């Protein structure tokens, strides 16, 4: 069987859909985006949506290893952006209620099905060391709990970056 390299453009709704389950391999660097990079991403997205431009917004490239027909995708490049977008979605969800909140949360976690005994699943799995933290605060939409944590008590720099970028996004949304 020959291996193929293919490229495709997807809208954000498809990127965070049941078509993909992203896994960050252990060999990838930890989450390292600074508040500056996060602020630029937020500003770019805000400006694009405020202009109501008919053109597509290029969010950047993501390189995956993924078999056709499979949800699981190993993230080779783009993990910083995917992680930051998930933090943004969680921050937005924390400010919403009802159906609006649910519509945002399904971009962070697949719904599952109690009748089929399928549990909800995160769409993004970080490196093992940071996944429990990310799952609890970001994928669990506990933004207030995350922001209340003492950064000196966190296990590593990746967790502090998650908190700081969440704070940056939270403040930016509140200012809008």
Predicted regions and their residues:
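Glycine- and hydrophobic-rich flexible loops that cap the catalytic core of alpha/beta enzyme folds
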Residues: 1-176
């Amino acid at each position: 069987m020959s291996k193929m390299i293919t490229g495709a453009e997807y809208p954000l709704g498809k990127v965070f859909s049941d078509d993909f389950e992203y896994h960050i391999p252990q060999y990838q660097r930890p989450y390292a985006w600074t508040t500056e990079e996060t602020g630029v991403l937020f500003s770019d997205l805000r400006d694009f949506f405020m202009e109501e431009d008919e053109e597509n917004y290029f969010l950047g490239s993501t390189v995956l290893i993924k078999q056709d027909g499979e949800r699981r995708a190993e993230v080779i490049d783009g993990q910083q952006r995917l992680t930051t977008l998930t933090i943004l979605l969680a921050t937005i969800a924390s400010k919403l209620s009802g159906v609006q909140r649910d519509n945002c949360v399904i971009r962070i976690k697949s719904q599952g099905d109690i009748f089929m005994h399928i549990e909800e699943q995160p769409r993004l799995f970080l490196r093992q060391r940071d996944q429990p933290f990310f799952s609890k605060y970001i994928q669990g939409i506990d933004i207030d709990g995350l922001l209340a944590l003492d950064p000196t008590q966190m296990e590593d720099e990746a967790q502090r970056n998650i908190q700081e970028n969440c704070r940056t996004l939270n403040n930016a949304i509140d200012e809008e």
